[in-house]
Amino acid sequence: VYGFHRAHTGVDFGAPTGTRVKATGDATVEFAGRRGGYGNLVILRHQNGYETYYGHLSAFAPGIRPGRAVSQGDVIAYVGATGVATGPHLHYEVRIAGKPYNPLSVKLPGSPPLAAAQRTRFLQQTASWSDKLGLLRGTNLAALD
């Protein structure tokens, strides 16, 4: 786009304009607005110095503003092509203590283990599915060539 090489600090995911963008983890909205080549940008601040950037957005989800708490899976914005972009896509970036890391290979902290009551509930809710999937073990499906 610029005619020269410039560091790219994230990963781009092509998607149609308006595709929902979801928070990748529980966080607080640090920034939601326009910022240079990112165009419309949301920055989420997670625990322990982690931040995630979501760039080139067409619009922000209702209520997304600095200070707002979001949960993993909440819709925060919509894919677009704002800023320096040749087509609609999501620019996704992970930063730790301000330094960018490759989102596809960065080692992130795991989730805390479930409390005993939550684990029991999870196992109860998944038992029937586990049984159904168990029936498929050893099953060979015929296919037409």
Regions found by a protein language model. Give the residues of each.
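Catalytic cores of peptidoglycan-degrading enzymes
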Residues: V1-S128
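C-terminal recognition in membrane/secretory proteostasis and scaffolding
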Residues: Q124-D145
